[in-house]
Amino acid sequence: MSEISIGDNSQFGESVKIYDHNHQYRNLNLLINQQGYVKGKVIIGSNCWIGSNVVILKDVVIGDNVVIGAGCVIFKSIPSNSIVYNNQNLTVTKYKV
């Protein structure tokens, strides 16, 4: 729909999704699939590692030499030479028998 560009030597884990568009939703009287799309470029630099299950949304530039950890949702641009990861707290609870 718009443009997706991937630099040299960039690698992707399983199930990475890249979206260069999104649905418009401005008119409550129309179904969402009748309202068209908003488009935007996605540019991924060279020598990047994009982990499994990462989602990259429109209007994003990922610089060179970037590592993105598994499961991240990238909704804003990432400068070169950066590491991005999800810092979620993992809660483990034991069953009471």
What residue ranges belong to the model's regions?
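Flexible, glycine/small-residue-enriched loop-and-beta-strand segment within the central core
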Residues: 1-60, 87-97
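Beta-rich strand-turn-strand
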Residues: 51-67, 72-76
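Extended alpha-helical regions
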Residues: 70, 83, 90-92
